[in-house]
């Protein structure tokens, strides 16, 4: 079992991100996604600092080397600030379905980046597992119920006629892939929670700069007064940038980046049960088939 720590951590990351996506979606509808991003990172900063202080005696990762700080901070800026900004804007321009479909490119991009930056190479069985898993994920995304506009169904092909939206989604996928690879390069055996802390700090500073340029601070202050939204952000921050990102770094620390990224991409599949149970959504046969295919691909990583 020890040899699969990375793969297990990758799956744990996907479960955490499934939970956080539901809470952040609800909060984002109330206070906006940009405010959610800034506040969640601030909350994660204090959560991570508290954990670091309890078991390492340091609230801030002051024992990190210059190498750790440089690459992990860069990872936080690329992954959290740039990647998330582009992805959330893509949600607005072309919708969540097309954005998540483009985001399925993140694992192969992470594998390629891992090969270029870290010299990682995937075995044929791992490549096959990645292809099968991502095929299943894309089947699930493509077959999710389409939201209607003015009583008419929006065709998927119509959403692909927006090159700006596609570029934004592709930029988000690239940011997340490269951010993950940079985090692995930056850790080099350093503590996972402390590494996550550095990434979160860099991401938070990046968003602070963005808010200054966009002059959106008044919306943050309004958001902080929304008790219902703050509950969602708090729970989402716990499962997302606190637990989820920590698990993601644990994953890349113990397995290849491409494999870890593929397992983390299971969110569209894992969200099916809560969507049915809590939101009473209907699923179709193709979604079920896609989910089964995805898990068959995951199984190949454990052979």
Regions found by a protein language model. Give the residues of each.
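Membrane-interface interhelical linkers
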Residues: 1-16, 21-35, 39-74, 84-94, ...
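Selected transmembrane alpha-helices and immediately adjacent juxtamembrane segments
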Residues: 158-188, 193
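Residues that define the loop-to-transmembrane-helix transition and helix capping
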Residues: 34-35, 97, 123, 193-194, ...
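Alpha-helical transmembrane segments of compact multi-pass small-molecule transporters, enriched
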Residues: 43-47, 102-116, 131, 202-206, ...
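Hydrophobic core positions of alpha-helical segments in small-molecule transporters
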Residues: 12, 39-40, 102-105, 124-128, ...
């Amino acid at each position: 079992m020890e040899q699969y720590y990375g793969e297990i951590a990758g799956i744990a990351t996907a479960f955490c991100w499934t939970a956080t996506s539901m809470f952040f979606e609800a909060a984002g509808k109330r206070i906006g996604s940009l405010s959610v991003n800034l506040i969640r990172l601030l909350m994660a900063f204090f959560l991570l600092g508290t954990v670091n202080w309890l078991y390492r005696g340091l609230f801030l990762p002051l024992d990190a080397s210059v190498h750790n700080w440089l690459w992990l901070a860069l990872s936080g800026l690329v992954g959290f600030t740039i990647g998330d900004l582009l992805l959330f804007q893509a949600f607005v321009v072309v919708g969540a379905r097309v954005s998540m479909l483009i985001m399925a490119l993140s694992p192969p991009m992470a594998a390629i980046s891992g090969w270029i930056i870290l010299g990682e190479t995937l075995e044929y069985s791992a490549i096959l597992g990645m292809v099968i898993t991502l095929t299943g994920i894309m089947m699930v995304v493509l077959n999710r119920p389409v939201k209607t506009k003015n009583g008419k169904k929006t065709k998927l092909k119509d959403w692909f006629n927006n090159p700006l939206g596609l570029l934004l989604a592709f930029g988000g996928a690239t940011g997340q892939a490269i951010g993950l690879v940079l985090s692995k390069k930056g850790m080099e055996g350093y503590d996972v929670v402390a590494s996550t802390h550095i990434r979160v700090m860099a991401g938070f500073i990046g968003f602070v700069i963005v808010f200054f340029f966009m002059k959106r601070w008044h919306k943050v202050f309004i958001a902080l007064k929304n008790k219902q939204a703050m509950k969602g952000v708090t729970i989402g921050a716990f499962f997302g940038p606190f637990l989820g990102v920590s698990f993601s770094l644990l994953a890349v620390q113990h397995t290849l980046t491409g494999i870890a990224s593929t397992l983390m991409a299971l969110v569209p599949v894992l969200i099916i049960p809560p969507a049915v149970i809590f939101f009473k959504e209907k699923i179709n046969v193709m979604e079920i088939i896609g989910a089964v295919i995805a898990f068959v691909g995951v199984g190949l990583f454990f052979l």
